[in-house]
């Protein structure tokens, strides 16, 4: 398989009034095309910082990131970044919100708009396209947020705890919905989550981080069936064994 993303010895430090804080230390991993990778770790260990560095929003103190073999700043790969909250503009309709990346790119082509329209139709939001975010459920807003993230046809999706703002039952349903969209569209994805079950139910590989300064403790290849839904993966007898293994790794770090 071809590497879409490679992080090589990424480190991050920042200065406070008192001293220098080391957040990340020698983080190295790669993500293959079409792969779904989850990153888990203790609270405050720098998971979101890793996504921000990949997205080019935060400059690392050391190390190198390459996208399709080229340095991040020189690459032409499109990256979609979905935050914890849906961040839909309340004054815009669902359709207008999903068109936003096209507007940013000044892409006025009917072909691009039609592609977004097809996503809205395929994933059950077409009849709600003229509604405003407040008129939709939390799950539907998250679906709209993912479609907006994919509107510019990104090569790489970054998901920063996209289900954390939802109640447990809605979270399971939305996780299934978003997973189906990502797999159908064959999107290369990096998910950050504090939820072990969420990571296990979606990822091909799981990267386990230590407490700060964060290092990689382990990278696990998850042998659960990726052709079934996240909810079905949770029913696999191996799921609980994986959960216990990962929980012990994280608990050891506390």
Where do the protein language model's features map onto the residues?
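The feature captures the beta-strand-to-loop junction immediately N-terminal to the Walker
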Residues: 40-42
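Helix-to-loop junction immediately C-terminal to a conserved catalytic motif
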Residues: 55
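Conserved ABC transporter NBD signature motif
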Residues: 63-75
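Short helical segment in ABC ATPase nucleotide-binding domains corresponding to the A-loop/adjacent helical element
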Residues: 95-103, 113
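Conserved ABC ATPase "signature" region
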Residues: 110-128, 180
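Conserved ABC ATPase signature
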Residues: 132-136, 140
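A short, proline-enriched helix->beta-strand linker immediately N-terminal to the Walker B motif
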Residues: 151-155
């Amino acid at each position: 398989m071809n590497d879409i993303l490679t992080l090589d010895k990424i480190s991050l430090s920042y200065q406070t009034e008192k001293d220098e804080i080391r957040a990340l230390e020698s983080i190295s991993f790669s993500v293959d095309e079409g792969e779904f990778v989850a990153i888990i770790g203790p609270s405050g260990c720098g998971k979101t910082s890793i996504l921000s560095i990949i997205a080019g929003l935060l400059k690392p103190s050391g190390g190198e990131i390459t996208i399709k073999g080229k340095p991040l700043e020189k690459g032409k790969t499109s990256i979609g970044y979905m935050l914890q909250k849906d961040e839909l503009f309340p004054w815009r309709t669902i359709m207008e919100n999903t068109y936003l990346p096209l507007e940013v790119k000044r892409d006025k082509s009917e072909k691009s708009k039609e592609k977004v329209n097809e996503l809205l139709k395929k994933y059950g939001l077409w009849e709600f396209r003229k509604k405003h975010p407040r008129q939709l459920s939390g799950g539907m807003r998250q679906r709209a947020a993912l479609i907006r993230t994919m509107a510019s046809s990104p090569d790489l999706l970054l998901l920063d705890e996209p289900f954390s703002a939802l109640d447990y039952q809605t979270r399971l349903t939305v996780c299934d919905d978003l997973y189906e969209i990502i797999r159908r569209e064959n999107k290369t994805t990096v998910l950050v989550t504090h939820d072990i079950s969420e990571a296990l139910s979606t990822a091909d590989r799981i990267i386990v981080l230590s407490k700060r300064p964060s290092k990689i403790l382990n990278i696990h290849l998850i042998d659960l069936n990726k052709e079934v839904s996240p909810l079905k993966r949770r029913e696999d007898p191996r799921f609980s064994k994986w959960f216990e293994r990962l929980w012990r790794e994280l608990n050891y770090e506390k």
